Amino acid sequence: MNQKHSSDFVVIKAVEDGVNVIGLTRGTDTKFHHSEKLDKGEVIIAQFTEHTSAIKVRGEALIQTAYGEMKSEKK
């Protein structure tokens, strides 16, 4: 596994119930491959891997990366 993939991760903390965290695949076709639903206060640490190229957050959450911190908004 490429070392870069194993070190890139994000911390996502739900600010409201029902936050969806969706993993998307690498390759010629980007596809959904994993989903988690978080309730208020729950935290997930998501990692970019050889299979995961993007992470989508739907709902209000605090997102922390090596590049900084941001907050997603309600739809």
Curated annotation (Swiss-Prot):
<dbReference type="InterPro" id="IPR016031">
    <property type="entry name" value="Trp_RNA-bd_attenuator-like_dom"/>
</dbReference>
<comment type="similarity">
    <text>Belongs to the MtrB family.</text>
</comment>
<dbReference type="GO" id="GO:0045947">
    <property type="term" value="P:negative regulation of translational initiation"/>
</dbReference>
<dbReference type="InterPro" id="IPR000824">
    <property type="entry name" value="MtrB"/>
</dbReference>
<keyword id="KW-0805">Transcription regulation</keyword>
<dbReference type="InterPro" id="IPR023558">
    <property type="entry name" value="Trp_RNA-bd_attenuator_dom"/>
</dbReference>
<dbReference type="GO" id="GO:0003723">
    <property type="term" value="F:RNA binding"/>
</dbReference>
<dbReference type="Pfam" id="PF02081">
    <property type="entry name" value="TrpBP"/>
</dbReference>
<comment type="function">
    <text>Required for transcription attenuation control in the trp operon. This trans-acting factor binds to trinucleotide repeats (GAG or UAG) located in the trp leader transcript causing transcription termination. Binds the leader RNA only in presence of L-tryptophan.</text>
</comment>
<keyword id="KW-0694">RNA-binding</keyword>
<dbReference type="GO" id="GO:0060566">
    <property type="term" value="P:positive regulation of termination of DNA-templated transcription"/>
</dbReference>
<comment type="subunit">
    <text>Oligomer of 11 identical subunits arranged in doughnut-like structure.</text>
</comment>
<dbReference type="GO" id="GO:0006353">
    <property type="term" value="P:DNA-templated transcription termination"/>
</dbReference>
<protein>
    <recommendedName>
        <fullName>Transcription attenuation protein MtrB</fullName>
    </recommendedName>
</protein>
<keyword id="KW-0804">Transcription</keyword>
